Amino acid sequence: MTGIGEQSIAEQVRSLLEPVLERDGYELVEVEWARLAGRWTLRVFIDKAGGVGIDDCQAVSKTVEPILDVADVIEPAYDLEVSSPGLDRPLRKPRDFDRYAGQRVHVKAYGPVAGTAPGAPARKHWTGVLKGFRDGAVELDVDGVLHRVPHDQIAKANLEYDVEGDLRRKD
């Protein structure tokens, strides 16, 4: 399909695969369509209760390959990669923000957002402890101050793995 942008392909793939994966007990976390090392690559990130293993990735790959081939959404030759979202899992849906409440997150807005906390200047990035999703906004504690970032202003949000905290818990 000539002329279709990277975002459009990812959106089309998402709409094709999401219902199938949900039926099979998986959550479609993210779809990326990008040119890597000179080759087109479709990355499909999945999750499920209890986590994702290599067998899950193989099973999902076998499930989605024929769907993508029949739908013929992607014209150029490409590599398909299926994996877990990793330690820095992206957060997109309102339920993601509630599910990971208590975790450290980084949130990036499309542009500067004013009024996220009383007296706070407009900003584009926040890193803090996720409190959840309320009334159309993501709530997070940044250095003891509660910020509310409107969901429709968020370009990207993801978990931040706390290496030091994890090491302290193991001692």
From Swiss-Prot:
Keywords: Cytoplasm, Ribosome biogenesis. Signal peptide: none annotated. InterPro entries: Ribosome_maturation_RimP, RimP_C, RimP_C_sf, RimP_N, RimP_N_sf. Its main location: cytoplasm. GO terms for biological process: ribosomal small subunit assembly; translation. GO terms for cellular component: cytosol. Gene3D superfamilies: Ribosome maturation factor RimP, C-terminal domain, RimP-like superfamily, N-terminal. It is found in: Cytoplasm. HAMAP family: RimP. Required for maturation of 30S ribosomal subunits. Belongs to the RimP family. This is Ribosome maturation factor RimP. It comes from Anaeromyxobacter sp. (strain K). The gene is rimP.
